[in-house]
């Protein structure tokens, strides 16, 4: 379909511009989600009816500053590992706000994190915290650690970062921050 190809080419062009614009390292959540939506559209064209997605983030969060390319690696991992089962696969991006914090949740309908995967991520993150600088990790598996480290640098100690499984055993990764406190929450679900 010509319209689909045309829209995908436009999205790819905008994605490339977003990625290569090094003048901006901080964007609004609105800009980041717009980029993620374009990425998901391209993945939908690739996987067609096997992939569904939804983005439902509270309007009041859209002007929050975030590091550029902070959500896309989470979504990319959700597609990569969430498709380890029979389609259709669904990626959901949602938000939660309470009186002292907000968070963005990326969930998939895949098989979830294995205990071994959760232990590895936890070990890699703890290693990166203890040994600041470039983590000594293989290229494969840097996505979650990279997101954690960049989010921690950006937010200082006001960080929410969770990964694990939902009540129905699907994968979930959450990032967020506290409004007024110096609390830090790093949790393996």
Locations of regions flagged by a protein language model:
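Short C-terminal beta-strand
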Residues: 170-179
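Two-component histidine phosphotransfer core
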Residues: 1-164
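Short, solvent-exposed loop/turn segments at secondary-structure junctions
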Residues: 111, 179-180
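Intrinsically disordered, low-complexity acidic/proline-/asparagine-rich linker or regulatory tail/stalk regions
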Residues: 185-189
């Amino acid at each position: 379909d010509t319209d689909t190809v045309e829209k995908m080419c436009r999205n790819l062009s905008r994605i490339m511009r977003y990625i290569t614009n090094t003048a901006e390292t901080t964007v609004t959540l609105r800009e980041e989600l717009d980029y993620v939506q374009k990425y998901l559209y391209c993945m939908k064209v690739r996987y067609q009816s096997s992939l569904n997605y939804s983005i439902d983030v509270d309007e009041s969060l859209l002007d929050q500053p975030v590091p550029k390319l902070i959500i896309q690696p989470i979504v990319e991992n959700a597609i990569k590992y969430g498709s380890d089962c029979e389609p259709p696969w669904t990626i959901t991006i949602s938000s939660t706000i309470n009186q002292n914090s907000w968070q963005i949740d990326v969930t998939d309908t895949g098989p979830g994190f294995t205990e071994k995967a959760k232990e590895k991520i936890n070990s890699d993150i703890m290693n990166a915290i203890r040994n600041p600088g470039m983590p000594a990790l293989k290229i494969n598996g840097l996505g979650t650690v990279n997101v954690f480290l960049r989010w921690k640098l950006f937010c200082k100690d006001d960080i929410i970062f969770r990964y694990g499984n939902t009540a129905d055993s699907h994968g979930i990764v959450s990032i967020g921050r506290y409004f007024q406190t110096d609390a830090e929450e790093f949790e393996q679900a």
